[in-house]
Structures are given as structure tokens and as C-alpha cells.
Amino acid sequence: MASMQKRLQKELLALQNDPPAGMTLNERSVQNTITEWFIDMEGAQGTVYEGEKFQLLFKFSSRYPFESPQVMFTGENIPVHPHVYSNGHICLSILTEDWSPALSVQSVCLSIISMLSSCKEKRRPPDNSFYVKTCNKNPKKTKWWYHDDTC
């Protein structure tokens, strides 16, 4: 537990001091607990999400960094994207099978920024309706099938 807290403190400091472009840690979210962070995000300039505001929720288990955080979009504005379900779940391989303890909150944020920035057309995943009706509340409990190599 102590190593997890130490790692999260280090990553929290890095995120506060040098956040990825368009991302801001919601400081109030970490006042009571180190294991749940809200990160505010703005769509990058020149993308289909330019100027839109989103919020990410990161939840860390006691096994972090050996286990990936639970990451999902939350709030009223969930991006319409081929790899983002309308309930906020994100189909991104580094959040599951491609996770490595060498990755960090910063690297997850950069991957999400890149995923959104490369989108050319706003649309939901083809199985959105079925998935949202049948999925677990925790996206980490989903057995993801990556339909393409851009997840």
C-alpha cells in the first residue's frame, strides 16, 4: 500500500506541475482521497473536439502500478468517438492487456488525447447500445475485443 501511495503522490505532483496540454487536475478531487482523481480535459485545437470540455475519472486500486487504473469519461459530456461508449467506458488497450507499470497517469492522458485528436468523424462504437445495456459498471471487468489497431 505504501508503494502505491508513494507512486501516486509522485504522479500527482507531476500532473500538477506539468500537465499534458488541455488537461487539468481537478484539485478538489484529491483533497479527501489519493485513489480517485478527476481530470478536466479540453478538446485539442484543430480537432473535431476543439473547445469541447470533458472529464476523466481515474480510480486506483491498491495494486497500482502493477494493475492499470480504472479510467472512464464521466459527467454530462461524454465524447462521441468510435472507441468511447456512451456510458464513458474507453476501449484503449493500455487500460487493460497492454498496461505496464512503466506507464503513468500522464501516459494514459496522452494516449487519450491522441485517440481523440486522430478522430475524423464523431460516431459511437457499432455495439454501443448492446454494450451499455449489458456491461459491468467497472470497464476493467470487460473482456474487450479490439476491432482495429487504433484502440
UniProtKB/Swiss-Prot annotation:
> Has keyword Magnesium?
no
Kindly report the protein's main subcellular placement as a broad class. nucleus
Recorded catalytic activity of this chain's protein: S-ubiquitinyl-[E1 ubiquitin-activating enzyme]-L-cysteine + [E2 ubiquitin-conjugating enzyme]-L-cysteine = [E1 ubiquitin-activating enzyme]-L-cysteine + S-ubiquitinyl-[E2 ubiquitin-conjugating enzyme]-L-cysteine; S-ubiquitinyl-[E1 ubiquitin-activating enzyme]-L-cysteine + [acceptor protein]-N-terminal-amino acid = [E1 ubiquitin-activating enzyme]-L-cysteine + N-terminal-ubiquitinyl-[acceptor protein]
GO MF term list: ATP binding; ubiquitin conjugating enzyme activity; ubiquitin-protein transferase activity
Any idea which UniProt keywords this protein has? ATP-binding, DNA damage, DNA repair, Nucleotide-binding, Nucleus, Transferase, Ubl conjugation pathway
Q: List the disulfide bonds.
A: none
The record's Gene Ontology cellular component field reads: nucleus
**Which SMART domains does this chain map to?**
UBCc
Q: Name one GO biological process term.
A: protein monoubiquitination
Q: In which pathway does it act?
A: Protein modification; protein ubiquitination
User: Where is this protein found?
Assistant: Nucleus
Enzyme superclass (EC): transferase
Q: Where is the UBC core domain?
A: 3-151
The job of this chain, per UniProt, is described as: Accepts ubiquitin from the E1 complex and catalyzes its covalent attachment to other proteins. Catalyzes monoubiquitination. Involved in degradation of misfolded chaperone substrate and DNA repair.
Q: Which family does it belong to?
A: Belongs to the ubiquitin-conjugating enzyme family.
Q: What is the protein named?
A: Probable ubiquitin-conjugating enzyme E2 W-A
Q: Which gene encodes it?
A: ube2wa
